[in-house]
Amino acid sequence: MASGAKLEASHPPKAANAAAPAKKVHYPFWFGGSASCFAAAVTHPLDLVKVRLQTRGPGAPSTMVGTFVHVFKNDGFFGLYSGLSAAILRQLTYSTTRFGIYEELKNHFTSPDSPPGLFTLIGMASASGFIGGMAGNPADVLNVRMQSDAALPPAQRRNYRNAIHGLVTMTRTEGPASLFRGVWPNSTRAVLMTTSQLASYDTFKRLCLENLGMSDNMGTHFTASFMAGFVATTVCSPVDVIKTRVMTASPAEGRSQSIVGLLRDITRKEGLAWAFRGWVPSFIRLGPHTIATFIFLEEHKKLYRLLKGL
């Protein structure tokens, strides 16, 4: 009897020693869009300055600070938030789609015990980014137009009152096809953005947790999202410039010039430096936007787990 007890004590049941398997949590589809809306509200003035620099005409300020001062002086404080409704609409369509599909693909094809590799993440991010780019294109056209409108001569301004008014006006005056102007460069940019932002964030976060011994807290989220923002800005800069030029073109310019023609024209006039025109304001905007997006997203997830008792 004693020997049996001794044997039982020296060989406890395996279940007692086995670590509990990691539990997969299925988060709501809309979390990425919600987090991106919060981030857009915080960083919108930086996005507006980036667009103004990319589309500036002769005599317009050529620096970020100069553009800030110019907008504030001519349009007031709320001029820095011109086009905010379109920016929010864009996040509700574009970011909800790309984040949602990306997370669904991760949930379907991976498990907590077998995290996806970099190339798997890139493939999933590319697919979700392309679909998100198409879904968000109408709002993206509006966003770019509303941000750059005040920089145009009064006779050329479109004067959209808000995102809904802009959608109705564009459809009525330019036809439904105008909502998808620049859809190919925009979808290409969305692929690059989602790949360099979401896939790199997951990769940098795993590196921080597994290789650097960091805890899963806001410091880690900040570090991983900062690096993801740097990568995303550099990768997306050339396509971002092309997208902005195409979307701000007049209907006549849009019909008469192809993407190849636009590339040839701006390279001849500006040299290859056009590819990184506005990189600094792009990073100053995209860096904080990426950081804010992922921190808001992680907080969404944290609150969800708390409410669900997970």
UniProtKB/Swiss-Prot annotation:
Keyword Mitochondrion: yes
Enzyme class, first EC level, given as a word: translocase
Organism encoding this protein: Aspergillus niger (strain ATCC 1015 / CBS 113.46 / FGSC A1144 / LSHB Ac4 / NCTC 3858a / NRRL 328 / USDA 3528.7)
Record's GO cellular component terms: mitochondrial inner membrane
Outcome of gene disruption: Leads to fluffy and albino colonies, and reduced conidia formation, when all 6 genes ctpA to ctpF are deleted.
Subcellular location, principal: mitochondrion
Enzyme Commission code(s) on record: 7.-.-.-
Spans of repeat Solcar: 23-108, 115-207, 216-303
Gene responsible for this protein: ctpF
Matches recorded under SUPFAM superfamilies: Mitochondrial carrier
Record field: transmembrane: 29-49, 85-105, 122-142, 186-206, 222-242, 275-296
Xref: Pfam families: Mito_carr
Keyword line: Membrane, Mitochondrion, Mitochondrion inner membrane, Repeat, Translocase, Transmembrane, Transmembrane helix, Transport
Localization per record: Mitochondrion inner membrane
Membrane topology: Multi-pass membrane protein
Function: Mitochondrial transporter that does not mediate citrate export from mitochondria to cytoplasm. Its exact function has still to be determined.
GO biological process, one term: transmembrane transport
Protein family (similarity comment): Belongs to the mitochondrial carrier (TC 2.A.29) family.
Protein's name in the database: Mitochondrial citrate transporter F
